[in-house]
């Protein structure tokens, strides 16, 4: 059972965190009484602040200044957030409308981080779907001329690759249809690795009259699957980090390096597999030293209950946690809806 004193001290901590997030200035007992309805005396507030400092939730950086939250203080604050303020109907419609304007998967994801960085005023990042999760959805075969075919390979993550195939002998329309059906029969719903194996087998077993054309198509498709780019990130809003307070800006180069080199963020986002959970890593909770002065908020995006990748924001430890968590969660859900065609 939490005592009344403990509840009051949490309210004092909550007020300190809220004021510091708003101003990035140390918070004193006088300003707390002026801004918040704590219904206690100044002496009680000072005593509570002393206890909170002893417990490691706040710190007094200078003898004559007020207190600022520590990472432990932010963690207690975040863990105590139970009611995330939902976005307004107008905000939800604006998000969905902007994302639905994307012409393909990559454009939708690019729009998602642009939107997220604008909504949160932080740097936003999204991981493109990994090859491990991608499956071949369809392969279209379009005759450009009797001696040339266009292959259009589509994965369930929305990636589209187009390749031309030069033929040794012309194909009739009926033969193109047979070739298309055989390719889709071999490729359908397979992972990219399994698809490559299936293509190599198909090239050897195709009917004699289209075997040469099939071999050429399979060679092109195998090379296309092998040449798929490795995991990538899309970034937006890194300029937002330049407005950090003086105390935080000293670590800015390390944070920017982590974002630009991508390896650190890819490792972090690759571990995001839950579509419903928003994770908050505060300062030293981040495994990589480059991010130990920042807060990283992430969640998964995807459709049909399966995560395709992670997205989130990177910013200072004094960010608006409740608002940022709400917006990260909302954008991820709407990305999933757009990808699912809802």
From Swiss-Prot:
Keyword field contains Transcription regulation: yes
Alphabetical list of SUPFAM superfamilies matching this protein: GAF domain-like (SSF55781), Winged helix' DNA-binding domain (SSF46785)
GO BP term, pick one: negative regulation of DNA-templated transcription
Function: Negative regulator of class I heat shock genes (grpE-dnaK-dnaJ and groELS operons). Prevents heat-shock induction of these operons.
Superkingdom to which the source organism belongs: Bacteria
Protein keywords: Repressor, Stress response, Transcription, Transcription regulation
Family as reported in the entry's similarity comment: Belongs to the HrcA family.
Molecular functions per Gene Ontology: DNA binding
Name of the protein in question: Heat-inducible transcription repressor HrcA
Lineage per the UniProt record: Bacteria, Bacillati, Actinomycetota, Actinomycetes, Mycobacteriales
